[in-house]
Amino acid sequence: MLVVYFKTLQQNLLKHKPSHLEDELCFAVYSTQKLYNRFYSIVLKRYGLTYVQYTTMLVLWEKQRPMMVKELGERLKLDSGTLTPLLNRLEKQGWVVRNRNFEDGRCVMVELTPKALSLEHDVKHHIQDCVLPIVMTESEYRECVNVLYEISDK
């Protein structure tokens, strides 16, 4: 259903037809993003994480190794002005530690703490249990994610 909506919007954009606000892809994405941010703020509250902190943790959990701050920023599509305060808060809350690379002192490495490692399974399953049942089926969810990446990768 969402995929059909996006494809219809794409066809309308290609034809340069004027549209109503509800027909605009940008507004649909904006509205959905607001809804997800509100939802995630409630779900993640028990862990003291924001949505952006959660996505940062997902990348670190995925890698399961120390990462350069630059590499983390590239993966999250965040600049250092946004990433540094975010990492400061995660470090203060005990989720990550930062250390200078011994070989290159200019390079800062971010690494998971024992707290982060021990809570990984709990956080991921809590999110999954909350998100999938109320939003859509798992196959609809996958299809939606794929369509959004098709758009953002162009």
Question: Predicted segment positions?
Answer:
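Pre-recognition alpha-helix immediately N-terminal to the DNA-recognition helix
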Residues: 28, 55-59, 118
